[in-house]
Curated annotation (Swiss-Prot):
<dbReference type="InterPro" id="IPR002452">
    <property type="entry name" value="Alpha_tubulin"/>
</dbReference>
<dbReference type="GO" id="GO:0016787">
    <property type="term" value="F:hydrolase activity"/>
</dbReference>
<keyword id="KW-0378">Hydrolase</keyword>
<feature type="binding site">
    <location>
        <position position="10"/>
    </location>
    <ligand>
        <name>Mg(2+)</name>
    </ligand>
</feature>
<dbReference type="GO" id="GO:0005200">
    <property type="term" value="F:structural constituent of cytoskeleton"/>
</dbReference>
<keyword id="KW-0342">GTP-binding</keyword>
<feature type="compositionally biased region" description="Basic and acidic residues">
    <location>
        <begin position="1"/>
        <end position="10"/>
    </location>
</feature>
<feature type="compositionally biased region" description="Polar residues">
    <location>
        <begin position="11"/>
        <end position="20"/>
    </location>
</feature>
<keyword id="KW-0479">Metal-binding</keyword>
<dbReference type="GO" id="GO:0007017">
    <property type="term" value="P:microtubule-based process"/>
</dbReference>
<feature type="binding site">
    <location>
        <position position="145"/>
    </location>
    <ligand>
        <name>GTP</name>
    </ligand>
</feature>
<feature type="active site">
    <location>
        <position position="193"/>
    </location>
</feature>
<feature type="binding site">
    <location>
        <position position="10"/>
    </location>
    <ligand>
        <name>GTP</name>
    </ligand>
</feature>
<feature type="region of interest" description="Disordered">
    <location>
        <begin position="1"/>
        <end position="20"/>
    </location>
</feature>
<feature type="binding site">
    <location>
        <position position="84"/>
    </location>
    <ligand>
        <name>GTP</name>
    </ligand>
</feature>
<feature type="binding site">
    <location>
        <position position="118"/>
    </location>
    <ligand>
        <name>GTP</name>
    </ligand>
</feature>
<dbReference type="GO" id="GO:0005525">
    <property type="term" value="F:GTP binding"/>
</dbReference>
Amino acid sequence: MRHQQTERQDPSQPLSRQHGTYRQIFHPEQLITGKEDAANNYAWGHYTIGKEFIDLLLDRIRKLADQCTGLQGFLVFHSLGRGTGSDVTSFLMEWLSVNYGKKSKLGFSIYPAPQVSTAMVQPYNSILTTHTTLEHSDCAFMVDNKAIYDICHCNLDIERPTYTNLNRLISQIVSSITASLRFDGALNVDLTEFQTNLVSYLTSTSPWPPMHQSSLQKRYTTSSCWWQRLPMPALSLPTRW
């Protein structure tokens, strides 16, 4: 769980992973950056830019896999609306199925919303990427952009949520999902058990509707947590929208 591979072919986005607060988490050799923008075009990124980088990506992944004593699978974090997260990632997942067919692939997918859309082609990219996700992902956790904005605005009293607020909320969801891998427990001891315990039908890779996992626990603002009493029944009640 400690090895990461990060890819980015879009040079127009800020390189926060290289210069941000958490830059020391990622090894510099595992940060791959391209010089060409896919312009939010799924076909261009999937069939052109993706083919240019696939050998480099697979080589870096192979080196990380060789360092693992027992490779269980892959956790793929990506967005479905723009650039690298949709087109190149879907192409990479196809090759992961070819080279690591027996290894589990868990995807954490950020779905776009009309209220916070930044590109007109996001619906098209999402549909095309979803098809690949259904075919090559063993278990997919969907995160709705609008839902996390509503949680920050309505439940956490954040008037103008920043990317830091959104990422911290998503990190709490990922942390709760992977808790059984990091701590002792009876369920989900390894990645292969996620699909068995969470997916109802073999033809379905998504265990929950968008952001259902985040609704399992009530959220409190940072200002109210000092005086707000947190009884156990309130923590166990789901958040209603």
